[in-house]
């Protein structure tokens, strides 16, 4: 299925039905009083978070939603029938904003969370409501109210505890395969990851967290180059970023230090808040280095990057160091409440 994470839709709630001016007409009662019923309520439009969905593609092809108007009132004090509501199912993590003003309408963070998008109009009043001691035969009635209508922007941002950050082919997809049940495509060419992948990392019984892998970043990503810029927003909800660095690139012209600095620069250009998010360095593919050089290479990278925070040397392919990494992440997240709980 094609991954769509941003669309524009239009929602039109139904108008309320009109009230009616009617009078009671029965045998032997030639001049009965008013009995005009009220109009029915117009249909409203709701959004409902559904954890079974993972894309907004349905709204790319069906962007307009119109609820029906309420029925008009009738005589004999009969009220018009209210119109059915429309419920739009959306993935958990969808942010809904007003397309014109940018104002936040809803942030669907919980499964089955239901939010009103456009309210249906109230039904009009029948002439029964206007009867008084001075007006025994009122002919007044009111029309139904108009339903609300809006242009909305739907933006899907994945809900994950940990985000993987790195250049194409740094080994992000291999890592998420190694520590979770996720099975993203892995190959020896750039951009094998074309959309975010989520994996549940289970450390112990009842202890787990969610990891997100996005397409790799390249220089110029903040200005729109490559694929990663489009998906950087998916890291905004994470508690921790893992900066994956390939310490043994096949291309000898690639300098891991320069590449790491370029990626951090792109991150800062894109979003200062994301740049300041807690971040650990993960030196991947250490198994490709001679054993007696591995520590020296890591030390050199730490000094060149002036890095004093946490770091790990791993091999996502062989699994070396991955268990220690996941336990460290779990311990870090457990200090930050709330974290993802396994169900």
From Swiss-Prot:
Record keywords, A-Z: Cytoplasm, GTP-binding, Hydrolase, Magnesium, Metal-binding, Nucleotide-binding
Q: Where in the cell is it found?
A: Cytoplasm
GO CC list: cytoplasm
Kindly report, in one word, the top-level EC class recorded for this enzyme. hydrolase
What EC number(s) has UniProt assigned to this enzyme? 3.6.5.-
Q: Name one GO biological process term.
A: ribosome biogenesis
Q: Which domain of life is it from?
A: Bacteria
Q: Which Gene3D superfamilies match?
A: GTP1/OBG domain (2.70.210.12), P-loop containing nucleotide triphosphate hydrolases (3.40.50.300)
**Annotated binding of Mg(2+), by residue:** 173, 193
Q: Which residues form the OBG-type G domain?
A: 160-334
Write down the InterPro entries for this protein, in alphabetical order: G_OBG, GTP-bd, GTP-bd_Obg/CgtA, GTP1-OBG_CS, GTP1_OBG_dom, GTP1_OBG_dom_sf, OBG_GTPase, P-loop_NTPase
State the CDD domains in the record: Obg
Positions of GTP binding: 166-173, 191-195, 213-216, 284-287, 315-317
Pfam families per the record? GTP1_OBG (PF01018), MMR_HSR1 (PF01926)
The residue ranges of the Obg domain are: 1-159
Keyword hit for Lyase: no
Name the coenzymes or cofactors required.
Answer: Mg(2+)
Q: Assembly and interactions?
A: Monomer.
Give the matching NCBIfam families.
Answer: Obg_CgtA, PRK12297.1, PRK12299.1
Question: Which HAMAP family does the UniProt entry name for this protein?
Answer: GTPase_Obg
Under what name is this protein listed? GTPase Obg
Tell me what organism the protein belongs to.
Nitrosomonas eutropha (strain DSM 101675 / C91 / Nm57)
């Amino acid at each position: 299925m094609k991954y769509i994470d941003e669309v524009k839709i239009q929602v039109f709630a139904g108008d309320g039905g009109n009230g009616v001016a009617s009078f009671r007409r029965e045998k032997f009662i030639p001049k009965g009083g008013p009995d005009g019923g009220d109009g029915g309520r117009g249909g409203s439009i709701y959004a409902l978070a559904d954890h079974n969905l993972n894309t907004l593609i349905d709204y790319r092809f069906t962007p307009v939603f119109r609820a029906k108007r309420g029925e008009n009132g009738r005589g004999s004090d009969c009220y018009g029938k209210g119109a059915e509501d429309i419920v739009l199912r959306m993935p958990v993590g969808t942010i809904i904003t007003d397309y014109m003003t940018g104002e936040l309408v809803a942030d669907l963070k919980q499964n089955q969370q239901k939010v009103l998008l456009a309210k249906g109009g109230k039904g009009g009043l029948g002439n029964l409501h206007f009867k008084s001691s001075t007006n025994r035969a009122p002919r007044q009635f009111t029309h139904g109210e108009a339903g609300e209508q809006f242009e909305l922007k739907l933006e899907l941002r994945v809900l994950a505890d940990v985000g993987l950050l790195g250049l194409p082919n740094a080994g992000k997809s291999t890592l998420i395969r190694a520590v979770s049940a996720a099975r993203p495509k892995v190959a020896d060419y750039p951009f094998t990851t074309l959309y975010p992948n989520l994996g549940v990392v289970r450390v112990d019984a009842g202890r787990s967290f969610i990891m997100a892998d996005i397409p790799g970043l390249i220089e110029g990503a903040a200005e729109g180059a490559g694929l990663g810029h489009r998906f950087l927003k998916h890291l905004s909800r994470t508690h921790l970023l893992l900066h994956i660095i390939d310490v043994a690139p096949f291309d000898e012209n690639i300098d891991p230090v320069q590449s790491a600095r370029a990626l951090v620069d792109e991150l800062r250009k894109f979003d200062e808040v994301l740049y300041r998010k807690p971040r650990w360095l993960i030196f991947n593919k250490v198994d490709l280095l001679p054993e007696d050089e591995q520590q020296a290479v890591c030390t050199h990278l730490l000094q060149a990057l002036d890095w004093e925070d946490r770091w790990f040397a791993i091999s996502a392919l062989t699994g070396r160091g991955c268990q220690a990494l996941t336990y460290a992440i779990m311990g870090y997240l457990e200090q930050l409440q709330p974290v993802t709980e396994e169900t």
